[in-house]
Regions:
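A short, N-terminal "cap"/entry segment at the start of jelly-roll beta-barrel domains
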Residues: 1-31, 38-39, 141-144
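Short, conserved beta-strand element in jelly-roll/cupin
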Residues: 49-65
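Short beta-strand segments in beta-sandwich/barrel cores
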Residues: 39, 61-67, 83-84
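Double-stranded beta-helix
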Residues: 95-144
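Short acidic-glycine-tyrosine-enriched beta hairpin
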Residues: 70-88
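Short beta-strand His + acidic residue motifs that chelate non-heme Fe in jelly-roll/DSBH
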Residues: 65-66, 86, 91-97, 104
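Short, surface-exposed beta-edge/turn micro-motifs
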Residues: 26-29, 52-55, 81, 99-101
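Conserved short histidine dyad/triad with adjacent acidic residue
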Residues: 32-50
Length: 144
């Protein structure tokens, strides 16, 4: 009979930023905690992955996911416990509060081998800012 340690892995990430924690043959699960790139003050880049969908599940704090479809950028205020799947090839990024923690599931090593980054254009920034939820417009002290 197997012992508990070989049957159940427990992983935590309490630090800043993105950290893959569980790896399988073709996928990985990571936790993204607040980091400077997801702060509204640093709104500047957008990314896409050509070989994988990317799943986001908010479990603490507040976050808004923005995705681009053609000339339209849409922002979705994430709800805790809801699964959001960004399909492969879709430009996307996040704006988040400082207490945010998000579960991310994607192809293994996507962050190393399948991430294309670019600066957002002024028209994209305008569309994101126009759709911000109230929590993201509040002064930083209220957003913690």
């Amino acid at each position: 009979m197997a012992d508990l340690e070989s049957c159940l892995e427990i992983h935590r990430h309490a630090g800043v930023g993105y950290l893959p924690l569980v790896f399988s043959a073709g996928w990985q699960a990571a936790i993204l905690n607040w980091e400077p790139p997801v702060d509204l003050a640093n709104l500047g880049e957008i990314e896409r992955h050509s070989q994988t969908d990317e799943v986001f599940v908010l479990w603490r704090g507040r976050a808004a996911l923005y995705v681009q479809a053609g000339s339209e950028t849409r922002l979705v205020d994430l709800e805790p416990g809801v699964v959001y799947n960004v399909t492969a090839g879709t430009w996307h990024n996040l704006v988040a509060s400082r207490d945010v923690s998000i579960l991310i599931v994607e192809n293994r090593d996507t962050h190393l081998n399948d991430t294309e980054l670019r600066s957002i254009e002024d028209w994209e920034r305008s569309q994101v800012l126009a759709q911000l939820p109230a929590w993201a417009r509040q002064p930083e002290e209220e957003n913690r």
